[in-house]
Amino acid sequence: MSRIFVVYGHHNVNKSFNQEIRDTFCSEAKKLGHEIDLINLHAEKPIPFYDGSEPSEQILDYRKRLEQSDVLFMISPCYNLRATAILENWIDLVLAPKWFFSFKR
């Protein structure tokens, strides 16, 4: 089956609707035979804000795990029509141009 990389970006890890989504999704996916690689951004070592520097070992590790996955599933509450800052920062650093995508000329 598929390997699913789950990125959880909510500060309330025990009593939130997002936590219920995370737990239900992971449980049901495992029942179907999928492998789950879950990170909780609030439990991980904090990553710096994007400043244009070379990616850290932590970011390279996230990219490696993503490359080994078939599916990326991100979970975050929506504040002012946006994901949480911690998830948006993760997206900026991990899913960066030239590595995750490129622009056509």
Predicted features along the sequence, with ranges:
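Short beta-strand segments at enzyme active-site cores
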Residues: 37-39, 74-75
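Short catalytic/ligand-binding loop motif for oxyanion handling, primarily in non-cytosolic enzymes
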Residues: 15, 47-48, 81-83
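Secondary-structure boundary/capping signal
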Residues: 33-36, 98
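Secondary-structure boundary/capping motif
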Residues: 1-5, 65-68
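N-terminal beta1-alpha1 ligand-phosphate binding loop
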Residues: 2-34
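Short, solvent-exposed loop/turn segments at secondary-structure junctions
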Residues: 12, 43-44, 79
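Helix-loop-strand module that forms the ligand-binding subsite of alpha/beta enzymes
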Residues: 54-105
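N-terminal beta-loop-helix "entrance" segment that forms/cooperates
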Residues: 38-58
